[in-house]
Amino acid sequence: MKASLFAVIFGLVVLCACSFAEDQFASPNELLKSMFVESTHELTPEVEGRYCQKWMWTCDAERKCCEDMACELWCKKRLG
C-alpha cells in the first residue's frame, strides 16, 4: 500500500516538474519569436513612399532614420 501511494505521489511530482520545465524552456523561444515578429513592424512608410528606420535599426545614407530619430550607427530618439 505504501509503495503504490509513493508511486502516485512520485508520478505527480515528476509530472509537475516536467510541466514546469517545459514552460521554462518554451518561454525564451516565445520571447525570441515575439521580438522578431514585432521587429517586422518597425519599418514605417515615409511621405516619399520609402521606408524609414526606427529605434535600434542600423542606418546609413540609404537607410535613413524616421523623422523623430537621429542616426548614430543606429537610429536613436532625438533628445530635446
Curated annotation (Swiss-Prot):
One GO MF term attached to the UniProt entry: ion channel regulator activity
Keywords: Amidation, Disulfide bond, Ion channel impairing toxin, Knottin, Secreted, Signal, Toxin
A single Gene Ontology CC term: extracellular region
Expression tissues: Expressed by the venom gland.
Modified residues (Leucine amide): L79
Signal peptide: 1-21
Subcellular location: Secreted
Propeptide, chain numbering: 22-50
Disulfide bonds: C52-C66, C59-C71, C65-C75
Primary location group: secreted
Protein's job: Probable ion channel inhibitor. Shows insecticidal activity when injected into mealworms.
Family to which this protein belongs: Belongs to the neurotoxin 30 (phrixotoxin) family.
Recorded domain comment: The presence of a 'disulfide through disulfide knot' structurally defines this protein as a knottin.
Protein name: U4-theraphotoxin-Spl1a
